[in-house]
Every structure is written in C-alpha cells, then in structure tokens.
C-alpha cells in the first residue's frame, strides 16, 4: 500500500489518517532506514508478518518492525542527525587523552568526524563513507571497546558524584532549617530567662543579660555540629577533588613551552617595597613634568627589574621540553 507523503499535519498518521485530536494516545514511530512517520497501529498491521516496503510513495526501503523506534524530536531531520551522531560517535570515540593532550591533532580528528556525519546526513558519498566507517571500526576494535568501557566508567562516576552531592545538599538544607528553628527557640528562651532572672535576683541587669547569653552560647546544638561535619565532608569530597585535579592537569598541559618560567606564574616570587629602593636616576624621573604627565610611577620600573631578575629561577630546560 503506497501513500503520498503527508506533511500538512504532523499530528496525523499519513497512512490511516488517525488524528491526535481524536486519538490523544496515538504514538508515532520512525525507522532509521528512511525516517518516515507511521503510527504504531500501522506498524503492527503492515510489518507484523515480516519485512515490507515503506508505504510512502517513492520510498523503496524495506523496513523491519524491530527497527522502528519512538520519535523523540518533532523535526525528523533532527532525529536523523542525532541518530547518525550516536552511531558515528560509538565508533569514532577517541578523547583528547588518546592524543596525549595534543589539541591540534584532536581538533583535526573531530573535523574528520564532523565530515563523516555531514556526508551521511546529507546523502553525499554514502557508500564510500559507510565503508570508511566499517574499515575504521575493524582496524580499531580494541581501542573502541576500551573507550566505550572508559566512557561507561566516567558516566557511572558522574552519576555517583551527582547522587552524593544531592544527598549532602539535602542533609545540609535540613540541618540549616533545624538550626534556624533552634536559634528562634533560643531567642524566645533568652527573653523569658532574662525576665525570670531579673524578677528573682538583685544582680546587675547587664551582668544578668550577659550571663543568659553565655548560657545560650554554651548550648551548642547537635545540628550545628553535624552541619560543621557535613561541610568538612563536602570540602574533602573525593569526587570534587579528583575532578579539580584532572582539570588543573589539563590546563597545565595546555600551556605552551616557555624558556622564562615566570611569565605564567599567577603570584610573583617577590614582594614589591617601593620605599626601600633608592635609585637616584629613577627618583629624579618621578619629579620631572614630562614623566609625571605620562603617568610614570617608580614602582613600575622596580617591578619590571625584579620580574626580570626572578624570571627563569627554577627553570630546567630538559624538564620543560
């Protein structure tokens, strides 16, 4: 049964004309072979007995029922591109670590992957591109499997980290609320206690108030102790620390070679004390009008000299290369 491609109403099956307005539960499926939208009922009816030709006019693709999947995106072109990307990235799954941090080579690799995706998505040299994909998969089977396993491990680690942080934040929120409630109750107790003590003692008012406040300070709540402990746990979060270390390592590796070893230091190795230095020549310059007008400052000169003196200390060329 061949039907014209129906694009006028995205909420209607082009084969049986089932409308989502009359049948809110209608479910549309697509097959990665051609990405033509068909409702689930038509898929069951047409493809239950085995593979059959796509019912769209002009489409000669042979479809199988087990290949149909729920359409996620409204635009089938987006659906198609996402599926192609998933398939290609499952094969071309190298990361920057596989290039020893070489960003140039990694970018070339990503560009090659994007070329493959573009050709498959737009139907350019499909047979040749598919052959290239198969050849690469056969030659790099072990590397692909290793990267898939590493990716699964990273995803599991990420999920564990998310779960851990979510639980800790929830506990922290509950403890903070408990502390707020205790502080409110302590304030009420303080007011009542001050009134009670003043009515039963001849002690100075200020001393009485101070005594009550000291009593409250000594009553350190268990919730506050738990919150402090929780903050220590969050601070020493192994997931957070490992993530920061990886990022710092990558940033350090990305810094290009420099023979100076000092031009990339965030904090200088010296402390500038302008009043201590006495250079007659520089001192004379700060009193001359033309230098004052240009914004000259003696500290700039001293800072440059000290930077040049300290730059390069601790630099071992053989270790830098």
Curated annotation (Swiss-Prot):
Q: Name one GO cellular component term.
A: transcription factor TFIIK complex
The entry lists its GO molecular-function terms as: cyclin-dependent protein serine/threonine kinase activator activity; zinc ion binding
- InterPro entries found in the cross-reference section: Cdk-activating_kinase_MAT1_cen (IPR015877), MAT1/Tfb3 (IPR004575), Znf_RING (IPR001841), Znf_RING/FYVE/PHD (IPR013083), Znf_RING_CS (IPR017907)
Location of Phosphoserine modifications = 157
**Record keywords:** Metal-binding, Nucleus, Phosphoprotein, Transcription, Transcription regulation, Zinc, Zinc-finger
The places in or outside the cell where this protein is found are: Nucleus
Which Gene3D superfamilies does its entry note? Zinc/RING finger domain, C3HC4 (zinc finger)
Q: Name one Pfam family in it.
A: MAT1
What is the protein's quaternary organization? Component of the transcription factor IIH (TFIIH) holo but not the TFIIH core complex. Component of a complex consisting of KIN28, CCL1 and TFB3; the KIN28-CCL1 dimer is known as the TFIIK complex.
- Which PROSITE patterns does the UniProt record give? ZF_RING_1, ZF_RING_2
Remarks, miscellaneous: Present with 3050 molecules/cell in log phase SD medium.
**What is this protein's function?**
Acts as a component of the general transcription and DNA repair factor IIH (TFIIH or factor B), which is essential for both basal and activated transcription, and is involved in nucleotide excision repair (NER) of damaged DNA. TFIIH has CTD kinase and DNA-dependent ATPase activity, and is essential for polymerase II transcription in vitro.
In Swiss-Prot or TrEMBL terms, this protein is called RNA polymerase II transcription factor B subunit 3
Q: Which residues carry this modification: Phosphothreonine?
A: 258
Organism listed in the record? Saccharomyces cerevisiae (strain ATCC 204508 / S288c) (Baker's yeast)
| Repeat recorded as keyword | no
User: Which PANTHER family is this protein grouped with?
Assistant: CDK-ACTIVATING KINASE ASSEMBLY FACTOR MAT1
Biological process terms in GO annotation: DNA repair; nucleotide-excision repair; regulation of transcription by RNA polymerase II; transcription by RNA polymerase II; transcription initiation at RNA polymerase II promoter
**Main location per the UniProt record:** nucleus
Zinc fingers (RING-type) by residue: 13-60
